[in-house]
Swiss-Prot record:
Subunit structure: Homodimer.
Gene from which this protein is expressed: murQ
HAMAP family found in the cross-reference section: MurQ
One GO molecular-function entry: ether hydrolase activity
This protein's name: N-acetylmuramic acid 6-phosphate etherase
Note, other: A lyase-type mechanism (elimination/hydration) is suggested for the cleavage of the lactyl ether bond of MurNAc 6-phosphate, with the formation of an alpha,beta-unsaturated aldehyde intermediate with (E)-stereochemistry, followed by the syn addition of water to give product.
Length: 306
């Protein structure tokens, strides 16, 4: 065997799915039914990885609380999913864009088109993190459906060399790709409907894992109140409306009064809530919130104890 071209036939992500062997013969309703049936494998696979995902949430939240950052690193579909999840954190949780970052092999050009060979360079993955001043305070989540992308392994190895937390997300079992990293989130969903096309079930499973990881970490950081998005960045009309509805829900104010409260707070939902509940001015509420590490109940207790 040519060592320059490693054999991947043993990987479940590369295997042929016998249930879709007649894919090219199916009519459209049958195609839809087949895809739906295969996608039913995804949630159980993610649920089976729940203990590892929970540990990843806790380590990530601790790192972010201490001033560290979260980096997603991947190639192709895996990289795009990481960039997607990272890009949703600022509007959803009002995070600094530097706090959660997505890195894709081949750079931004690879978001819309394939960059040939980009995933095959382990040094490039490490160099990208070095260029972003990675430190031991940070968390790196390497995403590789088949578990073999050198770009991802290079990034994880660099993170480990600095003492940072390393998390690996893959859709192959450990008997195919052995464990190497601090946390291994394995979500094997079986062969794809279209053999080797990991943008399908593997991509769906990866998206679910990242959804849970980032949202769970933000919940731990106090970015929600109950299940409400109280740290939403009010950057457009849709989000302004959402912020007003959050205020009406939690304060029982009428919509007009809630909008006035939001504007008085500087479009900061948490500050607006503290203003309403404590009858304090915006600056005092913002100061209490900062002192409480962004935790709304703790900030309210500080204000109420004055």
């Amino acid at each position: 065997m040519d060592e320059r071209l490693p054999e991947r036939a043993h990987l479940v992500t590369e295997q042929v799915n016998p249930d879709s062997a007649r894919l090219d013969r199916l009519d459209s309703p049958s195609l839809v039914e087949l895809f739906c049936r295969e996608d039913e494998r995804v949630v159980p696979a993610v649920r089976a990885a729940a203990p590892a995902i929970a540990r990843a949430i806790d380590l990530t939240a601790a790192a972010l609380r201490g001033g560290g950052r979260l980096f997603y690193v991947g190639a192709g579909t895996s990289g795009r999913l990481g960039v997607l999840d990272a890009s949703e954190c600022p509007p959803t949780f009002c995070t600094d864009p530097e706090q959660v970052q997505g890195i894709i092999a081949g750079g931004t050009a690879a978001l819309t088109r394939s960059v040939e060979g980009a995933e095959d360079d382990p040094e490039a993955g490490a160099a990208e993190l070095a260029g972003r001043a990675l430190s031991a305070a940070d968390v790196v989540v390497g995403i590789s459906a088949g578990g073999t992308a050198p770009y991802v392994s290079g990034a994880l190895a660099y993170a480990r060399s600095l003492g940072g937390v390393t998390i690996f997300v893959a859709c192959v079992p450990t008997n195919q790709i052995p464990e190497r990293w601090d946390i291994e989130i394995r979500v094997p969903v079986g062969p794809e409907v279209l053999a080797g096309s990991t943008r399908l079930k593997a991509g769906t499973a990866t998206k679910l894992v990242l959804n849970i990881l980032s949202t769970g970490a933000m919940v731990r950081l106090g970015k929600t109140y109950g299940n409400l998005m109280v740290d939403v960045a009010v950057s457009n009309q849709k989000l302004r409306d959402r912020a007003v509805r959050i205020l009406t829900t939690l304060t029982e104010l009428e919509r007009t009064a809630a909008l006035a409260l939001l504007e008085a707070s500087g479009l900061r939902v948490k500050v607006a809530l503290l203003m309403h509940w404590s009858n304090q001015d915006p600056a005092s509420c913002a100061t209490a919130l900062e002192a409480a590490g962004g935790l709304l109940p703790v900030a309210l207790e500080k204000l109420s104890g004055r």
